Each structure stands twice: as C-alpha cells, then as structure tokens.
From Swiss-Prot:
Membrane topology: Peripheral membrane protein
Known role: Part of the Sec protein translocase complex. Interacts with the SecYEG preprotein conducting channel. Has a central role in coupling the hydrolysis of ATP to the transfer of proteins into and across the cell membrane, serving both as a receptor for the preprotein-SecB complex and as an ATP-driven molecular motor driving the stepwise translocation of polypeptide chains across the membrane.
One of the GO biological process terms: protein transport by the Sec complex
Region (Disordered): 872-901
Location of the protein in the cell: Cell inner membrane; Cytoplasm
The protein's name in its UniProt record: Protein translocase subunit SecA
Lineage, highest ranks first: Bacteria, Pseudomonadati, Pseudomonadota, Betaproteobacteria, Burkholderiales
Species of the source: Polynucleobacter asymbioticus (strain DSM 18221 / CIP 109841 / QLW-P1DMWA-1) (Polynucleobacter necessarius subsp. asymbioticus)
Reaction equation(s) it catalyzes: ATP + H2O + cellular proteinSide 1 = ADP + phosphate + cellular proteinSide 2
EC number(s) recorded for this UniProt protein: 7.4.2.8
C-alpha cells in the first residue's frame, strides 16, 4: 500500500524515465524545421560534422537530439517513413543501454536506426543482433538505404560466409547478424593461428532484437564448436535395446519409503527433465547389459572402467522416455533433426551433446554419427556481457525484467504505444480432455471463418499443429500450416495471415519479426510492379493505386469482422510466450481478440493443478464438452507459470554461476593466446617458461638450501638428458670445484640450456625459430585447452553428488576447476619447453615445415560442427543443489588496465597473479 502511494505521488521508475525522454524528444523537434531546409548533400554532411564534434570532446549524449533529428529527416526523404515520438523514446532507451519494450507493429526495426547511427559515429562498430539469417538480411537491406544516405557502411554477417566477406562485414560501421554467428565468430577468432585470420574488431555496442528470445530463452544453451570423437556405434545399438527391458516406476520414493504407486526400474522427473534408475533398476540393467554383451559377467556398472557405460545407459533412457518424434525432433532423410522448443523451427546441423543425439539416432534406427569433442564453448550470457554497451528490444520483456537486471544489469523500459491496442483477451476455457478441447478450437475457427475473420492458431509442437490441420481437412476448411517442417516461406505466410477467412496454424512463435497486417501485406506485390520493366511509370502508379484501393476494401472488411483472432491451444511454461502469441493481434490500435483453450491433460496443468481442477469438475458433475471459464482459474494457471518461470530462472542463474568459473579461465587462456599472436617475438616468454620448468626439475634432485649429501646429481643428469635433451656434466664439475651450493647448480643448468637454445637459434635464424616457438605454444595451448574443457564438463556432471557429503557443489566445482586449471598451466609449460629443448634442427626450412604442420593440424576443421548443447545436460542434477550459493557475483567482462604480477589474480583464487593464471606470462 505504501509503495503504491509513493508511486502515485512520485511516479514509478518507468514513468520518471519516460518523463526524461519526452524532454529530449521535444529537443529533437526543435531541429526539425532547420533540417528540412537543407539539401540532401548538406543533410548527409551532418555525419562528418558529428564525428568532428565527438573528436573535439563532445559526448554522444550531447549530440543525441540533433543526431536523432537528422535520422528522422533522412528517413522521411529516403524511406517515406517518419519516426513517431514513441520510437524516439525507444531509441533513447536503446542508446542508454536499456531494453525497450515496444508492442507488435510499433516499428522496432525503424526505432533501432536512431541509436545505431548515433553510436556508429564513434567508429568502433555497432552490432545489430537478430534471431535468424532471414531477418538479418531483410533488416540490413531495408535500412541500408537510410544508412548509406548518411554515409554509413552496412555489413551483413551470415552463416556460411567466407572469411573475406565476414571481415568486410565487421569492418563496416554497422553489422547485422544472428546471435549464433556473432558468438561463433568470437570463438573462431580465438582459435586462429594468425592475426589476419580474425574477423571481429572489438565488441563496443550491440542492440539485440527479440532480446527475450536470445538472452532468456536461449541462455541455457551454450554455443559449442566441436569435432568428432571416437566411434561407439556398436555400443549405442546394444544399449538401445536396454530401455525395453526396464519398467517405469510410478511415483518418486520419498525419504520415509513412501510415494511409490507402482514399483519399477526407473522413474522420470518431468520437472527437471531427468531419468533415474532405481536400486532394482541398477541390478536389472546390469543383468540385461551382460546378456547384450555390453558388460562383462560379474562386473558392476559403478566400476571405474564402466563409468562411460553408465553415461550411455542414461542417454538411452532419456532418448526413449523424454525425447519424442515430431515434438523434440523430426526424422528427415535418415537424420535426426532437433526442433527448437521456443520457435518450433528445425535446427539443421545442431546436435545434442553427451551422447544423447546418438542415443536418439539408435532409437530411430538411422545412421549413428560419432560423438563430438568440444573445441570451444561460451554461453550467450557471458558473450553478450563482454560488450561495452548492450541494449535490446522486444514486445515482451516486462515479465522478465528482474532477470534482465540480475543477470545482464539491463533495465527494462516499457515504451507507451503510438496507438492504444483494441484487442480483447478472453478468459481461458479448460476442458476435461484434449478431444473436447480440440472440438471447441475447431468450432471457434469455423465460426470465425463464416464471419470472414482471420485466425492465427498457436500450437506448442509440430504434432499438435498437424493434428489441428487434419481436423480442419475433415471439415474442408482451407488453412496454411507454418511449422518447422516448412519454414522457408514463413515470413510470406505470416504476412498474409491477416486476410479475410485466412486460417493460419503456427508452431509457437514461428514467423516472429514479421507483422500481420489486417487485409494482408501488399508490399511484395507493389515491389514486383516497381521492378517490372514492361510497364511505364504511369502504368506502375495506376497498378499500385488499384492494389492499395483493393487492400483498403479488404482491410475494412477484416476490421468489421473483429480483426485478427488468436487461438492458443495450450499454455506455455512462460507467460511471456503466451503474451507474444496474443501480441500478434491488435497492432497499431487495430481491433482483435484472443483466447486459450486448455485441457487437464496439458503438462502445465497436469503437473501443477490438474488434480484439483479435475476434482472440481467431477464435483460439479460437468457434462462432456462443458468448460471451466473463470478468472480465478486463469489466475491459478498464471501462478503455476510463475513457478515454472522462477524455476527456469534458477536453472539459468545456476548455469551462469558454473560458467563464470570456466569463463574466468577462458578469458585468461584467450588473453595468453592473443598475447602470443600479437607479439613479434616471444623469446622472452619462452625463456621465462624454460627457467621456471628447469628450476622445478632441479629442485626435485637438488632441494633448495640442501646439503651436498642430499643431492642426486646422477639422477638430475639422467633426467635432463633423457627427458629434456640437455647434457650437463654436473658431477665432474662439482668434484673439480672447492665449494658449490644448490643455487650455483641451478645456474649451471640454466646456462647450459640457454647455450643449447642459442645454438638452435643461430642454426635456423631468429625469424624462423620465433615462428616455430609461436606454433609450438599455440598448438600446446589449444590441444590442452580442449582436453581441459572435457575435464570441466565431466567434473560438472558429477559435482552435484558432493551435496550428499554436506558440501556445497558450486564451491567444490570452483575449487576443483581452479586446481584443474593450475594443472593445465603446468602441462602447457612442460609441453612447450620440452618440445623446444628436444627439437633437433638441421635447417631453417625443416623448422618452417614443422611449424606449418602444427598449424595445419590445428586448422583441420572439416568435421567441425557449430551447435547448441542440450540445456538440461549442462548442470547435471541441478535441481538438487539450487539453494547453494556461490560467493562470487557475475561481473560484466570489460577490457581494463593490465594486471600487475603482484596484484590479486582476476580468477578469484586469492593468489597473486604471477603465482596463478599469470604463471605463463
């Protein structure tokens, strides 16, 4: 009550921001009259003027009002579109590094041109991030006329582009591309063997379109570059037979032994999307695996040599119980193709990790492709936090405002619409069974069809969309299906979904990014007329006028019928996805309506509220086909959605807490790589590594501050000669000296090593040897880093078991990951020094060939795949330790001053930098 009173008196944070923006919008208006008097050349010259003012010390904020006015005037001249005041406010929010929530049809693409132009004036490059290649190319082509008029170059970064084209795209002032491609380019840039192979030029400012889809929905799906590992085809085929021999247990056994309705061999946790073997199931599985020839008689699944077998067993169980054809995946041309759970699109070329994809292939009887080895990986959370300034826009961000602030430090600003929506959102209708629900859906569609009202039916899976399509076929109702199986025409289909009597069935939010215009979109037809060389200008104008008049008549007809009607066949886990579906109707003040039809069989209701609602229906003796329709029930469903959203937020936050540990190590490894690439000569670095390694070797045989009786000079000589290729006659030297201490022995070894090194450099030439050293170091860093990623992955998958020992799994993961990284640095040091000390040089050309061979070995990327991992595999058993807290706060990654050798290490270990991650420097 007190908070509500304060908001009434002083306004909410959102109200206060909008008040500030309106003042700036008024300033933008003051420049308009003067700019209208300028010719095109003078208006375009404003770009150079702004750059000069910035170079003189002015800030972007000070020139923002005039720059926005210039963009608005240029847009009027070039594109015949003038930015509304609401779009100017959205542009200000984006410039300030906030998320602008703007409804469907409010012109987010045009809004982005304002902050994009302003920030591109710095010359550091602006990235505009979209969800797919089609939207990236469409928006870049659409807006490039405006940017080119103002003297800005536009690039498009698409998948499958060659290196030169990509580099040109990033060199442009403004670069459009997909979130995946920007992330993969970052990873690839940190795998190159030469500076010239990099394509990105820094991460200064990014605007993320459909920011909720990219930073929330896809935040649990890391980007992974992987290569194929060993072939286990026979094992997958054998273990695929196991699930059919096991029985499903109904109910989860509680600590007091209750909760099991029907005993079995495994049980499924639908909330966490995991499968677990029971005690009985372990014994049964061992017995069956022995029969299948996958396990030795008398051996245990828990034996160290069978750890990977256990991993295959769980992959097979998940494939059979949680992953279903035409829901999580489809089978096309003998391949298992993942279906995006958020958009319903096919994810060509993507594969689930940890053997799950192979288990599904074995289940479906298609060719099994090899498992993948991770070469590089990063989450969207950690990638996008590296930008100096990040902003986003979407029609549905407010429900996730807390997560945006908590994870990305992004504030959400709700921009008021240019025209108030007239859409009517009707109460949900809940039926006892799916059959009754679909009967009601078809009846509603039929009613709209008779009245000439267009309908958009939203489904959660391909299976459901095809079920509804089949029911409509039986009623002989014409319709179009938009799902992952045929998304090539999705933008065209969705653009025409507003025509009279049009029935469109869409999987989730397929076609997002394209407006549904009531009466249909005549833009494409108009553009075809414009490029028809057989027509004169007068004929073109007449045809376009006729087309627009016809459209206006159809538009009025649809308005009279009630606008676009939205039908939801199921509630999604997130209220935001439901709001996205509803938001397709009522654009720019158009009328419209929406209704969700639910059944007690829906997963959301079954898990959270099904039993209670079923009891109410039975108590009221409701006849078949009679729905429950009440505000209280709708609120109850939204409450269930909040629980799921909260749980999903916990999972994403937990993934980030784990990934932050790996991210610190990734940054340090990439920093070392870049230092090696950017240095003209790494001789000093190699000398430091050599000294560090040899001092450690000497201390084993000749301990520090030790007596001569404790020395093992013969052992040291043998170790140096056999392992490090260094012959030093220490015993004779000590016998011939009056007094020698341990320090002098170490100095003698270091001097001998330097003489051997200098002789190799003299023989090959400094330039050739420097190239060889660089190749050796990069080869060692890259190969061992890949092994380290696999080690971290295995550590993460089993770390939840530490909870049973009353230990915090996250703290244990952090501690052990740090120890693993320390081991990695030592292995790299020893590997590099050993390779350089033991190499036998006969000529410079031989050395060049060796370096070239190593570079080629690292660059063999023909079998590399770019994919999202299955988010559920990322934190094994994550629900069990969600409450445990990690004592580090996720921090934005920023470039800063160089860390001093005696400063605390950035990885959080508490050690000095020189004794931790800086050991290689």
């Amino acid at each position: 009550m007190v908070i509500g009173l304060l908001k009434t008196l002083v306004g909410s944070r959102n109200d206060r921001l909008l008040k500030q923006y309106r003042k700036v919008v008024a300033k933008v208006g003051t420049f308009e009259a003067n700019l209208q008097t300028l010719d095109d050349a003078a208006l375009a010259a404003k770009t150079d003027e702004f750059k000069s003012r910035l170079a003189s010390g002015e800030s972007l904020d000070s020139i923002a009002p005039e720059a926005f006015a210039v963009v608005r005037e240029a847009s009027v001249r070039v594109m015949k579109m003038r930015h509304f005041d609401a779009q100017l406010m959205g542009g200000l929010a984006l410039h300030q590094g906030k998320i602008a929530e703007m409804g469907t049809g409010e012109g987010k693409t045009l809004t982005a041109t304002l902050p994009v132009y302003l920030n591109a004036l710095t010359g550091k490059g602006v990235h505009v991030v979209t969800v797919n290649d089609y939207l990236a190319q469409r928006d870049a082509e659409w807006m490039s006329t405006l940017y080119n008029f103002l003297g800005m170059k536009v690039g498009v970064n698409l998948s499958q582009m060659d290196h030169t084209t990509k580099k040109e795209a990033y060199a442009a002032d403004i670069t459009y591309g997909t979130n995946n491609e920007f992330g993969f380019d970052y990873l690839r840039d940190n795998m190159v063997q030469d500076l010239e192979q990099r394509v990105q030029r820094g991460l200064a400012y990014a605007i993320v379109d459909e920011v909720d889809s990219i930073l929330i929905d896809e935040a649990r799906t890391p980007l992974i570059i992987s290569g194929q590992a060993d072939d286990h085809t026979d094992l997958y085929i054998k273990i695929n037979a196991l699930p059919s021999h096991l029985e499903l247990q109904i109910g989860e056994e509680k600590s007091d032994g209750t909760g099991v309705e029907k005993p079995g061999d495994y049980w499924v946790d639908e909330k966490s999307q995991q499968v677990y073997l029971t005690e009985r199931g372990h014994d049964k599985a061992e017995e069956v695996l022995v029969q299948l020839g996958a396990l030795d008689d008398g051996a245990s699944l828990y034996a160290p040599q069978n750890i990977t077998l256990m991993h295959h067993v769980y992959a097979a169980l998940r494939a059979h119980t949680l992953y279903h054809r035409d829901q999580q995946y489809v089978v096309q041309n003998g391949e298992v193709i993942i279906v995006d759970e958020f958009t319903g699109r096919l994810m060509q070329g993507r594969r689930w990790s940890d053997g799950l994809h192979q288990a599904v292939e074995a289940k479906e009887g298609v060719a099994i492709q090899n498992e993948n080895q991770t070469l590089a990986t990063i989450t969207f959370q950690n990638y996008f936090r590296m930008y100096g300034k990040l902003a986003g826009m979407t029609g549905t961000a407010d429900t996730e405002a807390y997560e945006f602030k908590e994870i990305y430090n992004l504030e959400t600003v709700v921009i008021p619409p240019n025209r108030i929506s007239q859409r009517k959102d009707k109460q949900d209708q809940i039926y006892k069974s799916s059959r009754e629900r679909y009967d009601a859906v078809i009846k509603d569609i039929e009613d709209c069809y008779q009245r000439g009202q267009p309908v958009l039916v939203g489904t959660t899976s391909i299976e459901n969309s095809e079920l509804i399509a089949g029911l409509l076929d039986k009623r002989k109702l014409p319709h179009q299906v938009l799902n992952a199986k045929q998304h090539a025409r999705e933008a065209e289909i969705i653009a025409q979904a507003g025509r009279p009597k049009m029935i469109t069935i869409a999987t989730n939010m397929a076609g997002r990014g394209t407006d549904i215009v009531l009466g249909g979109n005549v833009g494409k037809q108009s553009s075809l007329i414009q490029v028809d060389e057989a027509l004169s200008d007068l004929e073109k104008a007449a045809k376009i006028k006729s087309l627009q008049d016809e459209w206006q008549s159809i538009h009025d007809q649809v308005l009279t019928a009630g606008g676009l009607h939205i039908i939801g066949t199921e509630r999604h886990e997130s209220r935001r996805i439901d709001n996205q579906l509803r938001g397709r109707s009522g654009r720019q003040g158009d009328p419209g309506s929406s209704r969700f039809y639910l059944s007690l069989d829906d997963p959301l209701l079954r898990i959270f509220a099904g039993d209670r609602l079923r009891a109410v229906m039975e108590r009221l003796k409701m006849p078949d086909g009679e729905p429950i329709e009440a505000g209280m029930v709708t609120r109850s469903i939204e409450s269930a959605q909040r629980k799921v959203e909260g749980r999903n937020f916990d999972i994403r936050k937990q993934l980030l807490e784990y990934d932050d540990v790996a991210n610190d190590q990734r940054k340090e490894t990439y920093r070392l790589r870049n230092e090696v690439l950017e240095s003209a000569d790494i001789g000093e670095l190699i000398a430091n590594l050599r000294e560090d390694v040899l001092r450690t070797i000497c201390s084993i045989y000749v301990p520090l501050e030790s007596m001569e009786e404790q020395w093992d000079l013969a052992g040291l000589e043998h170790a140096l000669a056999s392992e490090w290729g260094l012959k030093v006659d220490l015993q004779k030297w000590v016998e011939g000296s009056d007094s020698v201490d341990d320090v002098e022995i170490v100095d003698r070894v270091l001097e001998a090593a330097k003489e051997s090194y200098d002789a190799k450099v003299d023989l090959s030439g400094r330039q050739s040897f420097a190239g060889f050293e660089r190749s050796v170091l990069l080869y060692s860093v890259d190969t061992h880093w890949r092994e380290h990623l696999a080690a971290l992955d295995h550590l993460r998958q089993g770390i939840h078991l530490r909870g049973y020992a009353q230990k915090d799994p996250k703290q244990e993961y952090r501690r052990e990951a740090f120890e693993l990284y320390g081991e990695l640095l030592n292995v790299i040091k020893n590997d590099v020094v050993k390779n350089i000390m033991t190499v036998e040089i006969r000529s410079a050309s031989e050395l060049d060939q060796a370096a070239e061979s190593m570079n080629e070995d690292l660059a063999k990327l023909s079998d590399v795949q770019y994919q999202h991992a299955d988010p559920d595999m990322e934190v094994a058993g994550s629900t069990g330790d969600r409450g445990a807290a990690l004592d580090i706060q996720p921090a934005p990654v920023r470039s800063g001053p160089k860390i001093g050798r005696n400063d605390p290490c950035s990885c959080g270990s508490g050690k000095k930098y020189k004794n931790c991650c800086g050991a290689l420097s």
